[in-house]
Amino acid sequence: MNIIFPQTYFHHTTISNVDDLRNLKIDESYNVNWAKACSVKVEGLFVDDLIPYIYPVVNNFLKRANISLENFELMQPWKNTYEKGGFQELHDHGDSFLSGCIFLDNPDPDFGNFYFYNRHAVELLKPQRQLLSNLFDSPFLSFVPSVVKGDILIFPSYLMHGVTMHKSEKTRTTISFNIDTL
């Protein structure tokens, strides 16, 4: 089997000092105009506060592709707080280059799950999806990465993703961000 046109990927690693991220200053000027189709508390964070945590991870990821971090910048990051019943609708960040999510809590069985969705799955008949799923021993429609507190995911911004309904009484908190080209 030859694989052509690989375009869906994500980078999964862990950052240290994740507890420090819980107490970052909130940017009160952050204008959230995109959260109408979901149920999540969104608060802007300051870029400079996140750079020490995010840039080393992004730099290591880009180095694998012989790409320099100096051609990119971290855009306005934000904190997501999910209460019981909260969710994030399926979406992408199509105007950016890379997107990411940092998980601030250990998972609970009733926590909402971050997931990736293959937007191209609908282009194939069910037998074709099954064939691809079996050949590559991986899901073809959606994928839920296994994450724990301190994990960070980096993925292309065009990759569809969301968060399933949060059913726990405990809050679920993440930090999201985009990386754009200069």
Locations of regions flagged by a protein language model:
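Catalytic core of non-heme Fe(II) oxygenases with the double-stranded beta-helix
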Residues: E83-I154
